Amino acid sequence: MSLVLAVYGKGGIGKSTTSANISAALALKGAKVLQIGCDPKHDSTFPITGKLQKTVIEALEEVDFHHEELGAEDIIETGFAGIDCLEAGGPPAGSGCGGYVVGESVTLLQELGLYDKYDVILFDVLGDVVCGGFSAPLNYADYAIIIATNDFDSIFAANRLCMAIQQKSVRYKVKLAGIVANRVDYTTGGGTNMLDQFAEKVGTRLLAKVPYHELIRKSRFAGKTLFAMEDTPGKDDCLIPYNEIADFLIQENPLASVPVPIGDREIFDMVGGWQ
């Protein structure tokens, strides 16, 4: 039985980079990992494979949507540390539902007998607004992880994600493992002062604090995980939070909870205390 993770977060805050490095940390600790990119940009797995791979939708289009004509080699690429990667892709802009594509991807994996092959399956999901479609990975997940930065817009999105997790937990087993604070900057960004307060309010915690560091940004553009980058000053410190997250996830029965989101207006009321 696979450990299934659903990683969400506001767009543009390093969610896919964080997901790829969590996958890398898990793989280097011996887990067989599948990362599933659930974003029409289909770049979630770029740091692992070093390329934009063919999406499930593209593969299905080539066989006129006959699932039975596809094999694992048509939709899965293997990258750094033996991590298998799949990109769901999405419909043309302005048409269709991206969430439907996620469901099709899971169905295809199940038909190919691949879904239970892995120790860990990580869904990296578009997460500014959780519509019914893009919340689909929560139906399969054991744990959700929210990636957030120490700013209002990111926390507002995180609260909406908590609402989705709470709603899904009524019918499904998913719980919130915690929040990963990304791009933490104690010099000009306030560290994690806003995130600490928010996490306490909704009944969760910060799983790890990923520092704001140029090397992490460069690794993304290089098409590599941070683990695959050359050793340079600061690299070891940057790797610590990813290893902390992996260690937490692979322990037996990691502590998790159903979040208790707060109202939108309450978040605005909290803003004054974040000056």
Swiss-Prot record:
Q: Please share the entry's free-text remark on the cofactor.
A: Binds 1 [4Fe-4S] cluster per dimer.
Q: What class of enzyme is it?
A: oxidoreductase
Among Pfam families, the record links this protein to:
Fer4_NifH
Name the needed cofactors: [4Fe-4S] cluster
Binding residue positions for ATP: G12, I13, G14, K15, S16, T17, K41, N182, R183
Q: Where Mg(2+) is bound, by residue?
A: S16
Q: Where [4Fe-4S] cluster is bound, by residue?
A: C97, C131
Which E.C. number(s) belong to this protein? 1.3.7.7
Q: In which pathway does it act?
A: Porphyrin-containing compound metabolism; bacteriochlorophyll biosynthesis (light-independent)
Molecular function (GO) terms for this protein are: 4 iron, 4 sulfur cluster binding; ATP binding; metal ion binding; oxidoreductase activity, acting on iron-sulfur proteins as donors; oxidoreductase activity, acting on the CH-CH group of donors, iron-sulfur protein as acceptor
Write the record's keywords in alphabetical order, separated by commas: 4Fe-4S, ATP-binding, Bacteriochlorophyll biosynthesis, Chlorophyll biosynthesis, Iron, Iron-sulfur, Magnesium, Metal-binding, Nucleotide-binding, Oxidoreductase, Photosynthesis
Q: Name one GO biological process term.
A: light-independent bacteriochlorophyll biosynthetic process
Q: Which NCBIfam families match?
A: DPOR_bchL
Which family, according to the similarity comment?
Belongs to the NifH/BchL/ChlL family.
Protein name listed in UniProt: Light-independent protochlorophyllide reductase iron-sulfur ATP-binding protein
Lineage, highest ranks first = Bacteria, Pseudomonadati, Chlorobiota, Chlorobiia, Chlorobiales
